[in-house]
Amino acid sequence: MANHDPISDMLTRIRNASEKRHQTTRVPASRMSRSIAKVLQQEGFISEISEEGEGVRTHLVLELKYSGKHRHPTIRSMQRVSKPGLRIYKNTRALPKVLGGLGMAIISTSKGVMSDRDARKQGVGGEVLCYVY
């Protein structure tokens, strides 16, 4: 079955694994999924990223983070914003603050994929891929 939106697929896999308290989850590897995973790691939502497989069948293995004695997921929610049928672009001043700054937005800019905080610091806007909190 063809996957028409690999970013939504990645977010859904991470969300489902996080809800079920899995230690790791596998995501098909691409430049975009690597970039999103790297941003999630830099912001503290994922502890480790590794790759397995070769060529077309390469997967990213993401080690999820949990907090506290009862292992509460660090990722509470992931929401896709810009979709293949309706792209959402924002300039620097219009970049959203997710939950008043407690969450983050992942933005695809001309300087690469980055968090909303980094995009504001660098003064660039772009496509709002998703919200994470």
UniProtKB/Swiss-Prot annotation:
Pfam families: Ribosomal_S8. It comes from the Bacteria. Keywords: Ribonucleoprotein, Ribosomal protein, RNA-binding, rRNA-binding. The keyword RNA-binding applies. GO terms for biological process: translation. The keyword Ribonucleoprotein applies. GO terms for molecular function: rRNA binding; structural constituent of ribosome. InterPro entries: Ribosomal_uS8 (IPR000630), Ribosomal_uS8_CS (IPR047863), Ribosomal_uS8_sf (IPR035987). One of its GO terms (cellular component) is ribosome. NCBIfam families: PRK00136.1. One of the primary rRNA binding proteins, it binds directly to 16S rRNA central domain where it helps coordinate assembly of the platform of the 30S subunit. Part of the 30S ribosomal subunit. Contacts proteins S5 and S12. Belongs to the universal ribosomal protein uS8 family. This is Small ribosomal subunit protein uS8.
